[in-house]
Amino acid sequence: MKFLLLCVLLGAAAAFDDDKIIGGATCAKSSVPYIVSLNSGYHFCGGSLITNQWVVSAAHCYKASIQVRLGEHNIALSEGTEQFISSSKVIRHSGYNSYTLDNDIMLIKLSSPASLNAAVNTVPLPSGCSAAGTSCLISGWGNTLSNGSNYPDLLQCLNAPILTNAQCNSAYPGEITANMICVGYMEGGKDSCQGDSGGPVVCNGQLQGVVSWGYGCAMRNYPGVYTKVCNYNAWIQNTIAAN
């Protein structure tokens, strides 16, 4: 059965096996200025700021109304760098399939533009698709344990490589579409997890992945699966232009 990396925390219970960072370390403050926390009274997913008014996240993180929290590091404290902006539009890809998680991508329009500064900034969309072996930065406030739960207040970072299509398909036979990539370690121990869903995978300074799904978290032979953002440049640009 497919366990989604959905950071849906209802009290102490996660509704799905969501992706959170396991095996990483606390990020340096403001070192990931493009990451946002999606909030509906609690942090439930991540996202990436791509313009001063648009955020990319995962379609499985959809809610009709979202508060986007920018400039966050410690999500339990007010640190003076935060901007909280409500969504004015939340647009899932029309081809999103909630069973296969194909086209697991969505755009959020902010009700007002963010103020860009050292703590809040955009990440470029990909100029092309990154090759297997490329090292990428994954970040989020998701679960840090593969067994049990520990949701950190401080943003976590993990460097991990893009895996080959062969490795990805061998881990998940028949489940990987052309719109997915695997990132991580076949030996396990380092991965995204519940609560990281929708968050960024940035390779060579460009947004190449969105945290999507996986079997458990950080399990041997089951790397994390991510939406392949380089396939969606036209959809992103056209959607922004039309809205």
UniProtKB/Swiss-Prot annotation:
Cystines in this chain: C27-C157, C45-C61, C129-C230, C136-C203, C168-C182, C193-C217
Report residues binding Ca(2+): E72, N74, E82
The name under which this protein is listed is: Trypsin
Its main subcellular localisation, reduced to a broad class, is secreted
Q: Which GO terms describe its cellular component?
A: extracellular space
- Source organism (scientific name): Xenopus laevis
Swiss-Prot/TrEMBL catalytic activity: Preferential cleavage: Arg-|-Xaa, Lys-|-Xaa
- Where is this protein localized, as stated in its record? Secreted, Extracellular space
- What are the recorded Gene Ontology BP terms? digestion; proteolysis
Q: Does the keyword Secreted apply?
A: yes
Which ranges of the sequence are coiled-coil? Answer: none
- This enzyme's EC code(s): 3.4.21.4
